[in-house]
Amino acid sequence: MALPVLIMGRSGSGKTYSLKNFQAGEISVISVEKGRLPFKSNIRLVKVPKDGGVKEPPKDYATLNRAKYAWIELMIQQSKAPSIAIDDSQYLLVNELFDRSFEKGFDKFVQMAANFRNLIHSINEMEDENKIVYFLHHTETDSDGREKCKTIGKMLDEKLTVEGCFDIVLYCQDHKFYTQSNGISTAKSPEGMFDLEIPNDLKAVDAAIREYYGMGEG
C-alpha cells in the first residue's frame, strides 16, 4: 500500500519550499489553490481543475467536489513519480465549504469529512508500495494553544481528527521540521525515524522514510 504523510504549518513556514531539492521525475505536485512553486524548478505541477475534470457539468456542488477528489486519486494512481505532494490540501475542505455554504443542515459537514478521509484511505489502499503522498496543509491553534491541522471548524472536527489518519505528521515552523509533539503541535513520527528537529528538506525526509520502511524509489 502507498503511504500518506502530513506536513503541516502556518503559511510561509516553508512547507512548499521544502520541495526544492527534488528533481523532475522524483516528485509530482498536485496544487489545490496555487499554480506555481516558490522557487525555480522543473518539477511537474498540475492544478486541480475547477470543473473536477469531468466532461459533463456536475449537477450540484456536492457532486463537483466529489469529482475533484476522484480526479486527485486518478492523478496519484497514474503518476510515474514515486512521490506526490498535494499542496494546500486544506483548500479541499475550505473550497467545498464555500461552494456548499447555501446548504442547510449538518449532513454536508459529514460529507466533507468523508471526502477528505476517503482520499487518505484510498492512498493507503493503493497497490504501489513505493509511493508516498505528502499533504502540505495549513495549521491553526486549538483550545489548548497547540498547533493542529486546519479544518473548517468544530462541526468537522467532531467528525474527523485529521492527524489521526496519518502515521507521520511533521510540523513546519521557521523553515524547520519538528517530528514529535513538543507541547506546541500535534506532530508525530515512528521511533528512531528522525531527530526531533530537522531541516525542512522534504527530499531528505523522503529518503529517511524509504530507508526506515525498506521502500524502493518507484
Q: Model-found features: residue ranges?
A:
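Conserved P-loop
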Residues: 1-79, 83-84, 91
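Solvent-exposed polar/charged
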Residues: 20-21, 125, 164
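Conserved nucleotide-binding/hydrolysis micro-motifs of P-loop NTPases
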Residues: 24, 33-37, 89-91, 139-143, ...
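Short, well-ordered beta-strand core segments
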Residues: 27-29, 133, 169-171
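P-loop NTPase motor core
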Residues: 83-160
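Conserved GTP-binding G-domain of TRAFAC-class P-loop NTPases and closely related GTPase folds
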Residues: 142-218
